[in-house]
Curated annotation (Swiss-Prot):
Organism, as annotated: Amanita phalloides
Location of cross-link Cyclopeptide (Ala-Pro): A11-P17
Family of this protein: Belongs to the MSDIN fungal toxin family.
Family annotation (InterPro entries): Amanitin/phalloidin (IPR027582)
Protein name (database record): Phalloidin proprotein
Amino acid sequence: MSDINASRLPAWLATCPCVGDDVNPTLSRGESLC
């Protein structure tokens, strides 16, 4: 992983609640960005 990816990882986790139904659309967007 590059430093850029390492910097974006915590930011993505912060935007991803990973709880409830919100995890579904958020996870899909996260995979698309990656």
